[in-house]
Amino acid sequence: MDGEDIPDFSSLKEETAYWKELSLKYKQSFQEARDELVEFQEGSRELEAELEAQLVQAEQRNRDLQADNQRLKYEVEALKEKLEHQYAQSYKQVSVLEDDLSQTRAIKEQLHKYVRELEQANDDLERAKRATIVSLEDFEQRLNQAIERNAFLESELDEKESLLVSVQRLKDEARDLRQELAVRERQQEVTRKSAPSSPTLDCEKMDSAVQASLSLPATPVGKGTENTFPSPKAIPNGFGTSPLTPSARISALNIVGDLLRKVGALESKLAACRNFAKDQASRKSYISGNVNCGVLNGNGTKFSRSGHTSFFDKGAVNGFDPAPPPPDPGLGSSRPSSAPGMLPLSV
């Protein structure tokens, strides 16, 4: 209205009609504005009621959400505590498992070392077993040789016994011959003094007496000895068919000495064989005891191969008979404490 220019009126009627028309126009616009205002107020009231309802719903929803949020916070706190507890337990379990793993690895290493030691001990035992088998085979071979030698020596011992009987018989006969020879010599001296012209007759009588004494032995001889050794009548030197000469007596004494030396050599061989058999038996028991102890031992002890020393007859093994010791002049020859040719045998 202020901005509008008021036109110039020529008359009062025009001015009145103008202002009347303008008032009606403003009245109509006022009426429209009031209707719009009423309509706007009604719409705003409806909108306010709707917004209030929505606000109530939003507040209720907000309260519910806050309650849910608080509940979720509590749950989150509980889950955090539970997670921390689970993490602590898991850490403890992991640390325990790591310790167990380290201990298991250490035990595994120890078991590997123990297995290697057992393998080495097994190899040592196998080598010792092979060496023991070889030594046992050698021992069995030597034992068989010793048994054969022992059987041979037993046969020689039986022969020695028969020789001892014959030697004793020959000694008795030689003693009787010496006594009778002394008697004959005394008788010859007496006869020479009494009758020096008949020496041949006395010699013939003496030879006949010597032959008679030789035909009758002083000691009885067994049946087996009579079958083995010839009697004085069957000696081809002429003891039973011709007079006993001094050379024949000397040869008989030499035979007796040779027999005594053979008897001494046989006794020394027999003593060596008995010592060897005893030592080999003790050695065999010692070896079997060592083998059993080495197999049953669980701490890896090794088999000792230099713990026992025995003796064997070098002459028996090599087939060489050493020279016998000089015999005693009597019948019984002393048995040596250690036979010749004995050497230490290490196993």
Swiss-Prot record:
Residues 314-347 are annotated as: Disordered. Residues 256-291 are annotated as: Required for localization to the centrosome and interaction with dynein, dynactin, tubulin gamma, PCM1 and PCNT. Its main location: cytoplasm. It is found in: Cytoplasm, Cytoskeleton; Cytoplasm, Cytoskeleton, Microtubule organizing center, Centrosome; Chromosome, Centromere, Kinetochore; Cytoplasm, Cytoskeleton, Spindle. Residues 241-280 are annotated as: Interaction with DISC1. It comes from the Eukaryota. This is Nuclear distribution protein nudE-like 1. It comes from Macaca fascicularis. The gene is NDEL1.
